[in-house]
Regions:
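Glycine-enriched, solvent-exposed interface loops adjoining structured elements
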Residues: 1-248
């Protein structure tokens, strides 16, 4: 098959079927052929696994959560993450109101240290993920936007409604990956799960994967000059919330 911007479930299944010597199908979802249905299953497993194999630019989204306390001096508060949230992109969390980066993720030990000592953090947003929620330490009484980038779990699209989703079920549903990644990974899974030697198929996939992750987005230039990161040993405990050496 030729490379296409949108490769459907039917195209992926038929490409894999043809490559392993199995007859193609005209309809995946209503097929009575167990081999075709298994290839479709392998394709969805491959798509899901690829979603967390790299920080794909086509799965990267920007979001904003309004952070506000329920009452003054609230110790911590949980906020809902986007429904398609899969994982944060590191170091993209900012408070748009103060134009300062948020500090996190705070580990469990430091979070409990802050809670037990009843430390009220008002100069910076501190955050962690717990029970699939975003938790903010000492949320402000006035709403402030917590901005971030994240990876979406929705690697596929409904072919009828164009709605993003996390699987392909209809013939015309399509995925967002380069076509060869899905075909080669699905093919490798076919060899593995059908009891054949899958080493060659996985080598084909790995070469394609290395290429695609290399060209997916521009790389950061490396330098030996000291960076612009924070020079603090521990940004949670080393910085007082008030005082700053002025007798406070």
């Amino acid at each position: 098959m030729s490379a296409a911007a949108q490769t459907t479930l039917l195209e992926v299944v038929n490409s894999v079927a043809q490559s392993v010597g199995h007859p193609k199908t005209t309809d995946v979802s209503s097929s009575q052929d167990e081999s075709i249905l298994r290839i479709a299953y392998y394709a969805n497993i491959a798509g899901t696994e690829l979603s967390y194999a790299a920080n794909w630019q086509w799965l990267t989204k920007v979001s904003e959560i309004q952070i506000v306390a329920d009452f003054p001096a609230q110790t911590e508060k949980a906020f809902d993450l986007p429904t398609d949230f899969h994982a944060f992109i590191d170091d993209t969390q900012w408070n748009r109101s103060t134009q300062l980066p948020a500090i996190g993720p705070i580990n469990s030990q430091d979070w409990q240290w802050l809670i037990v000592r009843k430390t009220m953090i008002t100069t910076r947003m501190m955050w962690r993920i717990r029970n699939k929620k975003l938790w903010i330490k000492s949320p402000p009484v006035n709403s402030q936007p917590f901005s971030f980038e994240y990876l979406s779990k929705n690697w596929a699209v409904d072919g009828n409604t164009e709605t993003p989703q996390d699987l392909m079920s209809k013939n015309i549903d399509y995925h967002l990956y380069p076509w060869q990644l899905m075909v080669l990974y699905t093919r490798a899974k076919w060899f593995e799960n059908e009891g054949y030697d899958s080493s060659g198929a996985y080598e084909d996939f790995k070469r394609a994967f290395m290429y695609e992750t290399g060209v997916d987005k521009a790389a950061t230039a490396l330098t030996l000059v000291p960076g612009q990161g924070y020079p603090y040993i521990d940004a949670v405990k080393n910085i007082p919330d008030t005082g700053y050496g002025f007798g406070g």
